[in-house]
């Protein structure tokens, strides 16, 4: 009598990779497809392959830049690996845990360790809450500190992000764009995370304010031993802040390497074309554009 053996899918990540404590994030063959329409003739559904088989690893305490043109799947990658939306397939390990295999309760327990800073600081902040409540809401919900230490803790976090204690009672509309982004960073930092996805955190800001926010992120990384996935279309910013860089095109990771190596010697034709569009601050120098 033939017995049917239950098929057990082998993990995509090796045991050695999982046991390496330096690997805070491991992404293997991540896919995220969005259904768009169903054919009347065949009855089959078509899909947009926003993320199509992306793999990379981020070392603890480092910053990985993720670049590419609009619509290439950068932000979808960041949101999916945090499980803000469900995957189509693939595996994502954060601190050795496969995040898509966790139950809702297990996921809730690790949420404080994985945070995100969104692109638009105004739309990502509740207009109905004062800044102190915005930053402290998650702290109170997850019991990060005892109740008697709550106020002092929020004050310390705000000051670390360049905000003042008297800002607690103000509302988001009373702040500039740069200050609002500091509030978003403070909200993420207050939960004592290990890993933060920075989803184009400076693209909506003036150049001078961009530099301040980038320097703030770097200082916080050193002080709190943070790891970043820095998503941006601004290549000069990515070159400044990142240790490694991944280049995405049409949902695929076409190139991934150390920052210095990829900027000095890009290999993929799309990477070369992308870098050829970086403006040179000297008007006497002409660069060959690759279209």
Report each predicted region and the residues it spans.
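Short catalytic/signature loops enriched in Gly
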Residues: 1-23, 35-42, 47, 258-291
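Helix-to-loop junction immediately C-terminal to a conserved catalytic motif
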Residues: 82
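Conserved ABC transporter NBD signature motif
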Residues: 90-98, 110
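Conserved ABC ATPase "signature" region
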Residues: 98, 148-166, 275-276
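Conserved ABC ATPase signature
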Residues: 171-175, 179
């Amino acid at each position: 009598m033939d017995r049917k053996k239950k098929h057990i899918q082998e993990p995509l990540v090796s045991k050695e990779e999982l046991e390496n404590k330096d690997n805070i994030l491991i992404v293997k063959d991540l896919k995220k497809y969005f259904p768009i329409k169903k054919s009347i003739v065949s009855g089959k559904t078509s899909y947009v392959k926003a993320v199509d088989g992306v793999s990379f690893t981020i070392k603890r305490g480092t910053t990985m830049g993720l670049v590419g043109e609009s619509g290439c799947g950068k932000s979808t990658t960041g949101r999916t690996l945090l499980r803000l939306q469900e995957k189509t397939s693939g595996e994502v390990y954060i601190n050795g845990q496969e995040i898509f295999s966790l139950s809702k309760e297990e996921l809730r327990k690790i949420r404080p360790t994985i945070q995100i800073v969104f692109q638009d600081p105004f739309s990502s902040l509740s207009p109905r809450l004062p800044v102190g409540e915005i930053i402290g809401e998650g702290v109170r919900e997850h019991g990060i500190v005892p109740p008697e230490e709550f106020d002092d803790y929020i004050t310390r976090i705000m000051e670390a992000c360049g905000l003042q204690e008297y800002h607690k009672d103000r509302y988001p509309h009373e702040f500039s764009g740069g200050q609002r982004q500091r509030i978003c960073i403070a909200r993420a930092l207050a939960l004592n995370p290990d890993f933060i996805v920075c989803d184009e955190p400076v693209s909506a800001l003036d150049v001078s304010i961009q530099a301040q926010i980038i320097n703030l992120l770097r200082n916080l990384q050193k002080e709190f031993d943070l790891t970043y996935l820095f998503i941006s279309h601004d290549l000069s910013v990515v070159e400044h802040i990142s240790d490694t860089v991944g280049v995405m095109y049409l949902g695929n990771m076409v190139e991934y390497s150390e920052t210095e190596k990829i900027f000095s010697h890009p290999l993929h034709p799309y990477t070369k074309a992308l870098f050829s569009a970086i403006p040179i601050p000297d008007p006497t120098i002409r660069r060959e554009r690759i279209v």
